[in-house]
Amino acid sequence: AALVLGRARKNVVVIDDETPRNWVTRETHGFVTRDGASPREFRKAAKEQIATYPTVQFASDTATAITGSDGDFEVKTTQGASYRTKKILFAVGNKDLPLDINGLTEVYGKSAFVCPYCDGWELRDQSLVIIVSGDKALHMAKVISGRTERYTICTNGSDSLTDEQREELKRHNVTVFNAPIQSINSEEGMVQQVVLNDGTAIPCTGVFFQP
């Protein structure tokens, strides 16, 4: 948005708290000419290109309050700055909310991910655990099956799968575990196994989960 507006010679302030969704990952994927770049490299290149347009400026800050109405807004930030503007564009994106599972924080962004389109290639043909339940289970099973045939679904204690959903997963030889997850065991950020409360240990080298 800042690039397009800068090229249109509009005065723009980008208020950015420098905590993007993908900050925990080592690489970003799916962007032509930037596939495999780290999030920091990607943002650095983006800012350098946008900085060539003199009407765009960046503020490493967080907006805390907006007052006024269309054509005359005031934006205040945590650092005490105040900006007057005619228009406001929200480009806040999404935030992943990791599940409350022991050991997930240590592997999140290294060998445990949310998006198979973003990180599935790197885990292709590996043994994976998919932490998901309900309608999302069938969707994730279809998506993951294109990356690997070796995957297991853990519902983490949820009993939201219908008999029809379980039967369809069974037809595709997908094993489903219903017990709550006790922990995700890892070494240096790489998943080794997922352990359930009933003592079942599922060896794997990667995890996908749905917040």
Report residues per predicted region.
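Glycine/Thr-rich phosphate-binding loops of Rossmann-like dinucleotide-binding domains
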Residues: 23, 98-99, 204
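Rossmann-like dinucleotide/flavin-binding elements
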Residues: 1-17, 108, 114-163
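Short amphipathic alpha-helical segments
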Residues: 2-3, 26, 100-103, 141-143, ...
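Conserved N-terminal glycine-rich FAD pyrophosphate-binding loop of Rossmann-like flavoproteins
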Residues: 4, 17-41, 165-172
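Helix-loop-beta segment of a Rossmann-like dinucleotide-binding subdomain
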Residues: 24-39, 65, 72-75, 125, ...
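A Rossmann-like FAD-binding core segment of flavoenzymes
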Residues: 44, 50-69, 75-77, 82-83, ...
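FAD-binding core/adjacent interface of flavoenzyme oxidoreductases
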Residues: 13, 57-126
